[in-house]
Amino acid sequence: GCLRFCLVSVLVMIIAFKMLVYFIICLLTVKVTSEVVDTSHGKVAGKLFKSFIKNVEYYGFLGIPFAAPPLQDLRFKPPQDIEPWDKVLLAKNEKPACIQFNTNLLKGQRLGQYGVEDCLYLDIFTPGTDRNERPVVTFLYNERFQNSYNKTKDYGPDFFIEEDVVVITISHRLTAFGFLSLEDTTVPGNAGLKDIVKALEWVKDNIGNFGGDPNKITLLGSQGGAVAADLLLHTGAKHLINAAILQSGTALSPMYLQDNAAERAFLLGEQLEIYTKNKEKLLKELNKVSASDILSKEVRAAPKEFYKENQKSVLTFGPVVENDSDGLLTKYPEDSTEKINIPIMIGQTSREGLASSLNYLTRPTDLRYINKDFPFLLPMRLKYKFDPNHDAYYEAIEDIRKFYFTKNKITEKSISDYITYVGDVLTYYSINKMADMYSNSSSRVYYYNFDYYSDLNENKNNILRMSNIEEGTWGAATGDELCYIFKCPRLKDKLCISVTAITTNTKNKIKFIFRGGSHTRNVIFLLRIWNFHKILNCINCTLIINNKIKIK
């Protein structure tokens, strides 16, 4: 029984990559009728859709509340219980995203502020409500806990639906609204993470009524969503997760788990002309300020020189380690001693540094300024901590320059070297280390690298359109695998033509075969064993996804 469950959980994780072969897709979404389902809080009515490729009918239940609206005095607090409803809730339209400020040019979204504070809702897409044994994929996607793109206009569930998998998307609070902390029990922080936990609890209690198995829940996180999933696996909420996929993100990245959380809250207050050193007064006044004003001022609330002194990027608000022993996240993941005995797929794209290098791809001459102000971003929590007031700090920078940059020189021709460096320090080092940590904690870890390129590589193609040079832009950019596992409506013109990509023959090869009933612990892929990741002598442990899919 345990072995069978583990194998099924792994199957859920790798179904995503089976979808690499669907490239001829025509948009067809039809509202036909509705379905009413009982939940722990009341009845909900969804609507019927049809999928892209096979016209498979499925139900969508959109905008189901899982917590009380986080308004007024609840603005920065952990999520509270939602009141039950008596009438049938019409769950037929998606709710707005959580309030955020979009600066990402790559997604084609409207720049600036959008979203609302009343945003704690989830969406469920199911092939049917007739039986409660389908695997469940819960999708989390945010970028650095500042922006979120997990609505159907961004990523649709069709490909999973056609594999008879239930898909759930969760909206959680972002920026200061989700991660302001006063470092006390009044506002301990991590409200956005606690939103996810609240939603997962609701899913655990109710997904059986939507055709899903509450014991087959896979958390699929991309970028900041992967960080959130990673963090939750190191908390008491891990029992809500039966398997996990971490795409291009872990909590070990130098971008996350910032210090000085309360100081940041007071700096935000000063930006909003709230001058006080009293936490209760600060909270009271912040609750009176408009959400728009908070969002526009929070970027200025990072401590001065924080970037240089702490080897971290300047994200004003994000997840924190809580001081309260009863909090959600009370230890750094690397200090956790808990066993995490579930299947985990973890990996990255081949050129994670592309998006972070966009400024230099558009203005290569600006690279010369790096000679004077080198971005020293080695993850300090992985024993790479250096004091900028000591010679060792500058000696380390010199060693890095010698290792990454040809002849130790950074010029406008160094863009390829810079992309490699940024990808390593912000993503690859921390992902490799986290894979090692999970391996040591008894988890069954499957490691992959996505290196495929076609018209479906949305981020890479947008980067190329904005770049003035192509040097160093080989491979796949961060997030490029998403449009191979989810329907991307904005690429429908690309999806409705034959793309030069993995052929139908590859479709027949991409099959994971499980030896039911035997004692093997590994996966058979392309007639070769995809071994668990391990620290030393790891042979056939990495799945390479490109034109010639292979294991090495």
Over which residues does each language-model region extend?
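Classical eukaryotic N-terminal signal peptides for Sec-dependent ER targeting/secretion
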Residues: 1-25
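Non-catalytic accessory segments of hydrolases
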Residues: 26-193, 214, 493-509, 513-520, ...
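Substrate-access "cap/lid" subdomains that shape
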Residues: 108, 198, 205, 238, ...
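Alpha/beta-hydrolase active-site loop
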Residues: 188-207
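Active-site loop->helix "elbow" adjoining a glycine-rich segment at hydrolase catalytic centers
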Residues: 195, 223-225
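Alpha/beta-hydrolase fold nucleophile elbow
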Residues: 212-222
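Short glycine-enriched nucleophile-adjacent loop
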Residues: 226-237
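Mobile gating loops/cap/lid regions near enzyme active sites that modulate substrate access
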Residues: 420, 428-546, 552
